[in-house]
């Protein structure tokens, strides 16, 4: 199944219902550059990746990075993989995930990274990982 087709289909089917349950506004989309870009976001709720991807509208296809454990969730793991999620094994230096992300960025696309590598609750102090900086410096 074509990744771009599934991404667009999910956007058109899921977003109208999701936005009713979680109304959000997006500001600053005009600051997203053309070409490859690393989008870094806070991650405090389970729905954050969906909200960020859908807030970017269909103008850009945003590929989020997600923990590999999600790939093992029946049906959801398959669907997310087909929609373009780059699974990363946070317990190891995941060379495959890094190469896939760099390739995507070099093709001029958008990559969504949560710098802490996990959800962070309000008041928690979690040190960020170096992945976002690595992607930005390696792709210019």
Q: Which residues does each PLM region occupy?
A:
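Soluble catalytic domains of membrane acyltransferases
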Residues: 3-7, 11, 18-140
């Amino acid at each position: 199944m074509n990744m771009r087709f599934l991404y667009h289909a999910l956007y058109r089917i899921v977003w109208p219902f999701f936005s009713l349950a979680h109304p959000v506004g997006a500001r600053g989309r005009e600051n997203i550059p053309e070409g490859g870009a690393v989008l870094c976001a806070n991650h405090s709720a389970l729905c954050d990746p969906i909200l960020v991807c859908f807030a970017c509208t269909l103008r850009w296809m945003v590929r989020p990075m997600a923990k590999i454990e999600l790939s093992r969730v029946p049906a959801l793991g398959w669907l997310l993989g087909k929609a373009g999620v780059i699974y990363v094994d946070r317990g190891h230096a995941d060379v495959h995930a890094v190469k896939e992300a760099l390739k995507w960025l070099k093709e001029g696309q958008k990559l969504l990274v949560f710098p802490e590598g996990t959800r962070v609750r309000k008041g928690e102090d979690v040190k960020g990982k170096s992945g976002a900086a690595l992607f930005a410096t390696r792709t210019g």
